[in-house]
From Swiss-Prot:
This is Class I hydrophobin C. The lineage of its organism: Eukaryota, Fungi, Dikarya, Ascomycota, Pezizomycotina. Its main location: secreted. Residues 1-22 form the signal peptide. Induction: Primarily expressed in sporulating culture. It comes from Aspergillus fumigatus (strain ATCC MYA-4609 / CBS 101355 / FGSC A1100 / Af293) (Neosartorya fumigata). Aerial growth, conidiation, and dispersal of filamentous fungi in the environment rely upon a capability of their secreting small amphipathic proteins called hydrophobins (HPBs) with low sequence identity. Class I can self-assemble into an outermost layer of rodlet bundles on aerial cell surfaces, conferring cellular hydrophobicity that supports fungal growth, development and dispersal; whereas Class II form highly ordered films at water-air interfaces through intermolecular interactions but contribute nothing to the rodlet structure. Keywords: Disulfide bond, Secreted, Signal.
Length: 155
């Protein structure tokens, strides 16, 4: 009975540790940090809005959560075997989730002075292209709804 209890406890601890180490890391990118990929500092709001296209809205987001983006180095016999089975492994790519976004208007009031309407003057945080009508993936078993994409990631 005592041996069975110790074995069960050992299996539970081992499973918990394996699961916890296989999870992707979550990192919140604070406001002052540079956004990745970096944008051209001379880009105007009109150019950025054109890059987003007609189905997306240019937005300025205060908060970005970055998940994943790490590479694991496995050593020894069987190292990394369980993390690969649990969905981990080497070269997991990152996903940026944008939050607290506000719309950036491309319409600029007409001023007598010729001023550049630079994007970096209107948004010091993270610039993203957000869907005008966010999708709903709740009815689909495989569907994923990504309402915002970093402007630097748009081709």
């Amino acid at each position: 009975m005592l041996v069975t209890m110790r074995l069960s406890r050992s299996i539970a601890v081992f499973t918990l540790v394996t699961y916890a180490t296989g999870l992707p890391s979550l990192q919140v990118i604070p406001r002052g940090e540079p956004q990745l990929p970096l944008l051209d500092p001379s880009m105007t709001i009109k150019e950025a809005a054109r890059k987003c296209g007609d189905k997306a809205q240019l937005s300025c987001c205060n908060r970005v959560v970055k998940a994943g983006d790490y590479t694991s180095v496995d050593e020894g016999i069987g190292a990394g075997l369980l993390s690969n089975l649990a969905g981990g492994g080497s070269g997991i790519s990152s996903i940026l989730a944008f939050d607290q976004c506000s719309r950036l208007d491309a319409q600029v009031p007409v001023v007598l002075l010729p001023i550049q309407d630079l994007l970096n003057q209107h948004c010091k945080q993270n610039v993203a292209c957000c869907q005008k009508n966010p999708g709903d993936a709740s009815s689909s078993g495989v569907g994923v709804s990504l309402p915002c994409i970093a402007l630097g990631s748009v081709a």
